């Protein structure tokens, strides 16, 4: 089902399921991204196929740590039978509804924020130990995680949280706010 077709709520629910099960397209990752993370000993990913496939494409020889901790913030299709929209419009409606408390059998916004609070220390520890932490995950959860990292003394130095393939966001510890324990150098945490 394409993103440009007008669909109802049931078709959007199927679209979500299909997207969650999908892998990645054959396009290789951008060379500048591959070079940015080349020295990483491991890559963190969600347990979804597209995240794992992307992680392997980026760092084929690094240790892969796949965990539901980094899974995308969930979407559910609101039952609006009279409405037909394109999938991206449905995604906006579903996300707004989710923020408003619509969570039929899925993780709530508050639970996603809590998961981000659990995920941030994993990346911070990796960055402090190895000088880099690489996460290949999903746009909306990455944005929630980014807010959590900023609250913990990290700052975004490049990129923006966008819903695009191979989107890259780089964080460094903001030494003016929270110097690294026993270190003065910044540590980068690319969040895919």
Regions found by a protein language model. Name each.
Residues 69-85:
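Signature for phosphate-centric chemistry
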Residues 1-69, 86-96, 100, 104-117, ...:
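Active-site-proximal alpha-helix that buttresses catalytic centers in soluble enzyme cores
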Residues 51-53, 142-145:
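Short, well-ordered alpha-helical microsegments
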Residues 83-98, 176-192:
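A polyampholytic, Gly/Pro-enriched intrinsically disordered region
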Residues 37-38, 123-131:
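Glycine-rich phosphate-binding loop signature in dinucleotide/nucleotide-binding domains
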Residues 11-13, 150-179:
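Domain-level recognition of soluble alpha/beta enzyme cores
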Residues 68-73, 160-164:
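Short, acidic/turn-prone active-site loops that include or flank metal/cofactor-
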Residues 44-45, 127, 131-140, 144:
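Beta-strand elements within well-structured catalytic alpha/beta cores of enzymes
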């Amino acid at each position: 089902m394409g993103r440009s077709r007008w669909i109802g709520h049931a078709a959007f629910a199927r679209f979500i399921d299909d997207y969650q099960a999908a892998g990645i397209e054959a396009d290789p990752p951008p060379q500048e991204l591959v070079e940015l993370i080349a020295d990483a000993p491991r890559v963190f990913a969600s347990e979804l196929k597209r995240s794992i496939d992307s992680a392997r494409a980026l760092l084929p020889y690094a240790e892969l740590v796949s965990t539901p901790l980094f899974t995308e913030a969930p979407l559910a299709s609101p039952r609006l039978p009279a409405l037909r929209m394109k999938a991206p419009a449905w995604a906006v409606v579903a996300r707004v509804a989710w923020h408003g408390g619509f969570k039929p059998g899925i993780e709530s916004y508050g639970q996603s924020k809590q998961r981000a609070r659990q995920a941030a220390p994993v990346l911070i520890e990796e960055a402090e130990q190895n000088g880099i932490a690489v996460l290949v995950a999903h746009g909306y959860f990455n944005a929630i995680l980014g807010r959590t990292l900023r609250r913990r003394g990290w700052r975004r130095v490049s990129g923006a949280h966008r819903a695009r393939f191979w989107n890259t966001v780089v964080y460094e510890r903001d030494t003016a706010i929270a110097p690294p324990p026993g270190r003065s150098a910044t540590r980068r945490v690319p969040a895919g």
